[in-house]
Amino acid sequence: MAVKKKRGETKEMEAEKILVVDDNKEIVYSISELLKYEGYETLKAYDGMEALDIMERENVDLILLDVMMPRLNGLSALMKLREKSRIPVIILSAKTEESDKVSGLTLGADDYIEKPYNPAELIARVKAHLRRYRVWSNMEAEKKKDPDQIVNGGL
C-alpha cells in the first residue's frame, strides 16, 4: 500500500504508528500533526488508562507519553506497559527536575524530553528510537527462526 509522505513523496510500506498520550488536547493535536507531516500514522490518548486500552488493540511502534495526567499518570502507565512490551517510550513532560528524569528512565522510558519541546529535536529522537526498535525487532525475529534455517539460509 502506498503511504503519502511529506511533500508528495510516496513510500511502498506501511507508515509507522505512534501513540501520542497527553491530557492537553492542543499538545496531542500539534504533535500528531507534526508526526503526520513526517509520514507517521498517529493514535491519540488523553490519559494512561486510554493509552493502555489502545495498546491492547493496536500495534504501535513508539509512544510519546506525558507524566502528569488524570486517572492513570504516565509513570504508572509506563510500569504497566513494561510488564508486556519493549516498544520505545519517550516521556514528554513539563516536569524538569533531574529526579523526575531519573525516575522516568529508571522505570523503563527510553528517553525524556522536556516541554516545551523543540519540534526538530523531537522528530530526530523519534526517528532514532524507531531505527533502534527496528534493529532490535529484526534481531528478535532472527532468534526465533529455526537454527537450521539461519545456518543454511533457508536451504
Language-model segment annotations:
Residues 22, 66, 93:
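Active-site residues of response regulator receiver
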Residues 16-17, 128-155:
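Short, Lys/Arg-enriched segments at the junction into DNA-binding effector domains
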Residues 46-50, 73-76, 100:
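Acidic catalytic/metal-coordinating carboxylates
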Residues 56-58, 80-87, 107:
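Conserved phosphotransfer cores of two-component systems
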Residues 69:
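Receiver (REC) domain active-site loop signature in two-component systems and cognate sites
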